[in-house]
């Protein structure tokens, strides 16, 4: 590298998301202009695709996690109340990927209306190393789609 040339955001080809570029820019300012070395953690960044329905993801996929260690998968699909009331066929999918050994939630995946909103909050829990039991101890907000994240009690499959 050249000492006087810096790069952040998409040009680095690390994680091509606007909030990552903003975080990298702020870290650059802190490091270079405030003499406060500030690394950016590029692990476990939640992301969403704003299609219809939305898709949100954070952490490892089922396939990636299974290559690393034995896992449990908690998955559900259901018709959300808003679709039922409107007579629409829309369905929701939610999945938690859990380490069998440590019980840490390794990944969370949502396909649903407002999945981007839900995955942002799930991302905090996953980033903090929450366990499946931490999710289970959380009281659900009812009636919501996201309550399924804390009410899935039986693994769908183990690998």
Language-model segment annotations:
Residues 45-49:
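Helix-loop-beta segment of a Rossmann-like dinucleotide-binding subdomain
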Residues 1-44, 102-103, 144-145:
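Rossmann-like dinucleotide/flavin-binding elements
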Residues 33, 50-61, 66-159:
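Flexible, glycine-rich terminal cap/loop adjacent to redox cofactors
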